[in-house]
Regions:
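Ligand-binding pockets and gating/stacking loops
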Residues: 1-149
Length: 149
């Protein structure tokens, strides 16, 4: 999805497209039309902005001061929160599709991750990743792994 070319630089426009894509992907998986996909919310140097602000996500990662109490950049982090909320909607959609004795989610493995572990430095050390789904019984749910790097 090329947000600038499509004229959807604001998060609201991108979110509407993502939510439509969530439905299409869920149907494609349920109908066994695909088994592998990639969903990207914006390009690496994101030009997305919050409604009412001209500051882009990428600019905020470089220029926004880190909140000392919280330990992160509040405005830049909003973009990650939006992305993860959309991912959660996708996971919930898959969980709502019956398949066999369970759900489509029970038979999938859906990976989500952020581009960086720290927006300001663009570090990938300790990159947060999540996997949802049961992988057809091959994955054990509820496991937290803290990797060293």
């Amino acid at each position: 999805m090329r947000t600038v070319k499509n004229g959807l630089q604001g998060w609201t426009g991108v979110l509407a497209l993502v939510l439509a894509l969530v439905q299409v992907l869920a149907l494609a998986l349920a109908c066994d039309q695909t088994r592998v996909f990639n969903m990207v919310f914006s390009e690496g140097a994101s030009q997305l902005h919050q409604s009412g602000s001209s500051d882009t996500h990428h600019t905020l990662t470089h220029e926004e001061t880190r909140d000392e109490k919280l330990g992160y950049q509040v405005e830049a982090t909003k973009f990650v929160i939006h992305s993860m909320e959309a991912w959660a909607t996708f996971v919930e959609t898959l969980a709502g599709v019956p398949e066999g004795d369970g759900s489509l989610l029970d038979n999938c493995a859906v990976l989500a991750h952020s581009e960086t572990s720290d927006a300001n430095s663009h570090s990938v050390t300790g990159l947060p990743m999540m996997v949802a789904g049961g992988g057809g019984g091959r994955l054990r749910p509820g496991v937290h792994v803290f990797g060293a790097g």
